[in-house]
Each structure stands twice: as C-alpha cells, then as structure tokens.
Amino acid sequence: MFEGPRRYRRPRTRFLSKQLTALRELLEKTMHPSLATMGKLASKLQLDLSVVKIWFKNQRAKWKRQQRQQMQTRPSLGPANQTTSVKKEETPSAITTANIRPVSPGISDANDHDLREPSGIKNPGGASASARVSSWDSQSYDIEQICLGASNPPWASTLFEIDEFVKIYDLPGEDDTSSLNQYLFPVCLEYDQLQSSV
C-alpha cells in the first residue's frame, strides 16, 4: 500500500490543575464561549487557542453523551399518577462534568451566544452538585411524565358537546362587544371613541 506523508499529530495535552480550574469555571458559565473569550483564556493560561477550543468541544460532547445515557437509563414511564424518584448520579473522575443543562437558545445573549449553566461541575475537592441541578432533573422528569403519561385530558371525556358548553357559560349581555374595549390599549380606545362619535 502507498502511504502518503504522515500528518502531524499533536501530543496529548496535560493540563495543570490551575488550568483545569480556570477552564471549568468558564464552562460553568457557558458551554459556548465566544472566540474572544477563549482567546483571552488561552493567553492567560499559556495554552494554544486550538487546545482551548478542543477542550470545550470535548466537554460539550461528553455532556451530550451523559445526557443520552441518562435518558436511556431512566425507568420506563408508568401510569401518569405514579411518581418515581430520580437518583443523582455521581461521576468518579474529577475531570468530567455532570448535570449541566443548557438553557434554550432564545434566552441566551444574542451578542456572544453564551448558554448559561448552573454550577454543577465536579471539583477536584469532591464538592457535590448543587440543589438547583437536582431539582431541574426532577422537573424535567415530571414534564416528560405529564407529556407522555395521560393521552386524554380530563375534560376530553365529558359528555357535553362544545355547543352545550357555549350555552352553559354564555352570560346575558355578552353580545355587546363594546365592553371589551377596556382591554385594548389607550390609543385604540381613543380611536374607538372617535369612531363612535362620528
């Protein structure tokens, strides 16, 4: 076989504890730091920008993999009224991140595209994940249970038709729509008053 010139492979980077601490602190704030932020951090830590970029890329991949594993190891959902507790998982490695969740992109800052994270990073000292993170896990589980649990909402099983509901809740005097003008903006209300005086 013909082998072309071997591509240069960068040796594995070994981070100092102070470098890892600084990288994790930034990861706690955002999983997607701006290029300028990563450049400042790289020069401060005396690392190449490419090393910092790859570190964040690897942490995001690790986080996604952990999320997938958590979704696969969750117990199958039973009836909607049955509740089960979600146990906290702890990772033995001091370098890994655990229980970080991105906020929806609509909430993120449009200028630097940062996604805010709770402070749930494992520290080398063995600090435990914050209570906010564990409450998020249980909230997301509850939401899944609500969405996947009961397929028929309680009101869907009533014997009444929509027309009957309209008759039941129709109050006398609601045919006059001018009473709804109080809910409009003042500008619209003034326009409506001008139209009625003409």
Curated annotation (Swiss-Prot):
A GO term for molecular function: DNA-binding transcription factor activity, RNA polymerase II-specific
Keyword terms, alphabetized: DNA-binding, Homeobox, Nucleus
Location of region: Disordered: 65-133
Domain of life from the UniProt record: Eukaryota
GO biological process, one term: regulation of transcription by RNA polymerase II
Residue span of motif 9aaTAD: 125-136, 153-161, 163-171, 178-186
DNA-binding region: 33-67
Marked site (Required for binding to the 5'-TAATCC-3' sequence) residue numbers: I54, K57, A61
InterPro entries recorded: HD, Homeobox_CS, Homeodomain-like_sf
CDD domains: homeodomain
Main location (coarse class): nucleus
Effect of I54T: Increased transcriptional activity
Amino acid composition bias (Basic and acidic residues), ranges on this chain: 110-119
Region (LEUTX region): 79-190
Annotated GO CC locations: chromatin; nucleoplasm; nucleus
Locations listed in the record: Nucleus
Family affiliation: Belongs to the paired homeobox family.
Domain-level remarks: The 9aaTAD motif is a conserved putative nine amino acid transactivation motifs in C-terminus of the LEUTX region.
Protein name: Paired-like homeodomain transcription factor LEUTX
The organism of origin for this protein: Homo sapiens
Lineage start: Eukaryota, Metazoa, Chordata, Craniata, Vertebrata
